[in-house]
Amino acid sequence: MKDTIKIVLIGAGSKEFSRGLIHDLVLDKELPHVGRIDVVLVDINANSLRTMLGYAQRCVEVTGSPIVFSATENREEALPGADFVLLSVAIGRMDLWEQDFRVPLAFGMRHIYGENGGPGALFHALRNYKLIFPILRDIER
């Protein structure tokens, strides 16, 4: 068994997604049994990144979780040795997400909640490929 598990969260400045993930990690009673866990938060927005790192560290203080959080704005710096990489990135997330529901509805198709099904999901995927593929190439390296 590996001594350390490294998780990289790209787009960690997202308060909605990151906060939930941080809670899940620090509150999980099984994770301490798998060894050391390092979580690297990555975001291009330095202020949001700093806020989420502070939040993660406070959660560790309160819960006594053994997880070690760190942060960087440079994903290439964060990726080497990663066992898991999670992406929480999107172009124009909130502004365009509403459009993903409205456009299909105008043609009689009620879109389900989320980015995972129907024509709205296709819109979401197509506009984000340009953002996601360079990240995937960095992960491959």
Show which residues each predicted segment covers.
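Mixed-charge, low-complexity segments
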Residues: 104-106
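Metallocofactor- and cofactor-centric catalytic cores in central/energy metabolism, strongly enriched
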Residues: 2-101, 111-141
